């Protein structure tokens, strides 16, 4: 997940605009970070054909493709890109499946119950 240039590019993928805008607002405050948002897999496909990203933050529930399919698509389209899942799902089978998908981490967005499913990799380039 090494930045390709001086700017670290993040793509936030969530079908709830207020969630995406919040994540973008927070991440954009970091020095050297630029963010874009997408609300569906179709938008992701168009964006990733035009430009590269260093990290994708993905909601598992999208209107036109499930997150597992999107992860697979991103691995083939931009294999060097890190992937962080941000989801309301805490079901054991989902966590187990995520742990097999070569992603960088997963975080629950369940309000006061927010917790990490598994540790976000702090070292550039590391994956699970």
Predicted features by range, described:
Residues 59, 87:
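Active-site residues of response regulator receiver
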Residues 39-40, 66-69:
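Acidic catalytic/metal-coordinating carboxylates
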Residues 32-40, 47:
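Short hydrophobic/Thr-rich beta-strand motif most characteristic of the beta2 strand and flanking loop
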Residues 68-79, 96:
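Short amphipathic alpha-helix used as the core "switch/output" element in two-component signaling
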Residues 6-18, 23-27, 37:
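Conserved acidic segment of CheY-like receiver
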Residues 67, 98-105:
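As written
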Residues 63:
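The feature encodes the CheY-like receiver
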Residues 121-128:
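The C-terminal output helix
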């Amino acid at each position: 997940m090494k930045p390709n240039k001086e700017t670290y590019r993040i793509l936030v993928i969530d079908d709830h605009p207020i969630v995406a805008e919040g994540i973008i607002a927070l991440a954009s405050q970091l020095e050297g970070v630029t963010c874009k948002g997408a609300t569906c897999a179709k938008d992701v496909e168009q964006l990733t054909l035009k430009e590269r990203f260093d990290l994708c933050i993905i909601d598992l529930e999208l209107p036109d493709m499930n997150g597992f399919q999107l992860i697979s698509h991103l691995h083939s389209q931009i294999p060097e890109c890190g992937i962080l899942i941000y989801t309301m799902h805490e079901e054991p089978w989902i966590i187990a499946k995520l742990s097999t998908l070569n992603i960088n981490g997963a975080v629950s967005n369940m309000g006061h119950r927010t917790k990490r499913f598994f540790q976000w990799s702090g070292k550039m380039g590391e994956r699970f």
